[in-house]
Amino acid sequence: MVKLVLTEDETMLADSARGFLDKSAPVKAFRDLRDAGQTHDAKMWKEMAAMGWAGVLVPESAGGVDMGHAAAGILAQEMGKTLAVSPFLSTAVIAATALRHVSDARAEAALAKIASGDATYAL
């Protein structure tokens, strides 16, 4: 059965994300990045990584927080509200999910770089 109400932890995550994004990623920031031809704000991505967002789907053994897809969805929803420009979906969700299905040292190293915010992926 699908749950319709966020847990207390999920609500705290959403509130925290909303507070950060309201300050760090207003719609004006999106327009500025677009006009400058930039793909994302690298400084903001490092801040997101420091909060564990880049490692939301990365196993703890690789330096992630492994909070699951529900948490990733909450973060994506909050990012969408401010039009935050980040490599979150391509890197923290898609690449991390794909790399979790590979069991070798290269995948583990790549996951660690995702969690730290040192690598971004485009698929």
Where are these regions (language model features)?
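Glycine-rich phosphate/cofactor-binding loops in nucleotide/flavin-utilizing enzymes
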Residues: 2-3, 14, 74, 94
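Glycine-rich flavin
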Residues: 22, 26-123
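Intrinsic disorder at enzyme termini
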Residues: 1-9
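Short, flexible segments with low predicted structural confidence
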Residues: 2, 19-20
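Short alpha-helical segments used as structural interaction elements across diverse proteins
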Residues: 7, 15, 28-31
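A non-catalytic, amphipathic alpha-helix used as a structural packing/dimerization or gating element
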Residues: 12, 16-19
